[in-house]
Every structure is written in structure tokens, then in C-alpha cells.
Amino acid sequence: MKFKAIVIDIDGTITCENRELHLGAVKKIRILKVPVVLATGNILCYARTASKLIGLDGAVIAENGGAVTVRYDLNGTFEESLEECEKAFSFLSEYFKLTKLDPFYRKTEIALRRDFNLEKARTLLETQPFDVEMVDTKYAVHIKSTRINKGSGLRKLAEIMGLEAEDFVAIGDSENDIEMFEAAGFGIAVANGDERIKEAANYVTEASYGDGAVEAIEFLESNGWI
């Protein structure tokens, strides 16, 4: 079994607990001989900046799969519009005081501060015809299209790169990484990940956050899989 690339989440996976990039994980990623794609629920410019700081080529999946790009000098490909998300936001605003995060930069989804009852909001949303869902990344709650996720983003990016999604190992920590694990050939959850992502993983590290990412890569190397 040999994999051709790695797709890895940012926050909670290659960061410290305080969200700073984990220097050990960055160093490990820089010396890899396979392509590394960053995948995040955050905005495209954030993902590109992280890719640049780490020393990668700029291949990123942003906005939970809604935006992808393979190089810094190319415009991002956006897979959905905000129309349905805005309808859902307006509906939920009748019941909760919601605060948007990065509203001027997000093109395919709405991110909200995590200061409202998410389960109640999900229940209310189920009564409506909107083709959206709410995903908690532990850093924000995202209102996004049901057709878009990190898995669909990975398949799109893999196609552009001339690869299959199954050629990738996926590494992550949150429920928004589940579809990415399902699309990839192998999934690794870091120890601080939530229970749903651990259940979806093929392997769970003993270490957390960036230390877990280092452990994941060393596990792959020790098995000769990358």
C-alpha cells in the first residue's frame, strides 16, 4: 500500500492548543516527499497564508470544500453560492442572536460564533426546505450546502492534480473531516479529535494536536506508505 499525497486539516491538527502553528508539525511537513494539501473550514486567504508559511505549493481546500485551488497564482474554484445559506441564516436569526465570522471573505458558506444552542438550531432547520446543514468545527459553526464538504473538495482537487481521492491519506480532528476520511484512501485522527472522527478513522494517534500530526506522519513513514 503506497499513497501519493496527504491532505491535512489545520486548526487542531497541525496547530498547538492555542491555534498557533505547531513548529514540529511544520518541520515534518516541509521535508515530506509527497504533495501536502491543507484542508480547512476557514477562508481561502487563511488557507493560502498557512500554506505559504509552511512552505507548500499552495494546494488548499477551504470553506469546508467550497473553495479549492492548486497554486498561489490561480484563482480559487468556488463550488456553491451563499443564497441558500443566507435564507437559513435569516430563518435562524428569528430564534437566536447570531454573529457572522469573516462575512466579507466567505464565498460559499456562513460561519457563526459558537455562542448559541446548536442542537436546537439544527432541529429548527430540519423543519425548513433549505438544502443546507450546520457543522461544528470546534472553532465556528458553519452553515453550508449539503452537497459540499471536505470530501467533495478533495475529489475536485485530486482531479485537478491528476490523482484520485483514494491516493491521499487524510489527517484531521473534527466532524467536518469525516467526509474527507471517507473519500481518502486512509484516515488518521489525532488524539484530541472528537469521537465521530475517531470512529471514522483507520488509525488514531496517541498524541494530540501538532504532536499527533507528527506521530501520524511517522506512522505512515514507518509502514512505507508514503
Swiss-Prot record:
Chain residues that bind substrate: K150
InterPro entries the UniProt entry points to? HAD-like_sf, HAD-SF_hydro_IIB, HAD_sf, PGPase
Q: Which family does it belong to?
A: Belongs to the archaeal SPP-like hydrolase family.
The question of whether Endoplasmic reticulum is a record keyword is answered with no
Q: Which cofactor does it need?
A: Mg(2+)
Q: Which UniProt keywords apply?
A: Carbohydrate metabolism, Hydrolase, Magnesium, Metal-binding
Query: Which EC numbers characterise this protein's activity in its record?
Result: 3.1.3.18
UniProt enzyme class? hydrolase
Which is one GO molecular function term here? magnesium ion binding
Q: Which reaction does it catalyse?
A: 2-phosphoglycolate + H2O = glycolate + phosphate
**UniProt entry tagged with the keyword Methyltransferase:** no
The active site consists of D9 (nucleophile)
The name under which this protein is listed is: Phosphoglycolate phosphatase
Cross-referenced Pfam families:
Hydrolase_3 (PF08282)
UniProt-annotated binding residues for Mg(2+) = D9, D11, D173, D177
| A GO cellular-component term linked to this record | cytosol
Described purpose of this protein according to its UniProt entry: Catalyzes the dephosphorylation of 2-phosphoglycolate.
